[in-house]
Amino acid sequence: DAQLRTDFNITTGLQNDRIDGIKYKSRMKEFYAKDGVKTARHHLVTNLEEGLAFIAQVGYPVVVKPDNGVGAAATYKLKNEEDVKAFYADIPPVQYIMEEFINGTIVSYDGICDSNRDIIFETSHYFPDPVMDVVNDQLDLWYYSRKEIPADLKDAGRRTIKAFASNS
């Protein structure tokens, strides 16, 4: 889609020069950091030694997933050095990102904004089951919309929309 928007100079939506910021997880983190939104610490997977050095900083478990893409496909939780060595012994031929594992509940912030990036509608969803568990364990996905958006989530969500500089 971005290529078509670029080729035909369509200014709604992202063109090629900005698509990497939402296509690659490692690049997304730069946008979050720009406006002070916290993310899990990460390391682009290179070799076993550097992976173990990163794990020495953040501890076990860690999560590894393709840097490019969405969802939880080909995502793994590595719980110990044996898991890490097995992963590195058979790394798929794509760039992976390794992140510290953060235990918690997934809540989303979704906002629709106008051409000035002012929010015109916002909502939040609560996901009782971790998405990685839903995919890896083939669980049913379910979530519900929250009546109220917590102030800290609303603030982080609004800052994120401004940071990503999306087009209407």
Regions found by a protein language model. Give the residues of each.
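Internal nucleotide-binding/catalytic subdomain
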Residues: 78-168
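Short, charged, surface-exposed secondary-structure boundary motifs
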Residues: 20-27, 72-74, 132-134
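Short amphipathic alpha-helix with an adjacent loop that forms part of the alpha/beta core around
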Residues: 52-57, 89
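Short glycine-/acidic-enriched loop or helix-start segments at secondary-structure transitions
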Residues: 1-3, 73-74, 108
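A short linear hydrophobic-aromatic micro-motif
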Residues: 41, 61-63, 94-99
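Conserved N-proximal alpha/beta basic substrate-recognition cap immediately N-terminal to
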Residues: 1-46, 50-53
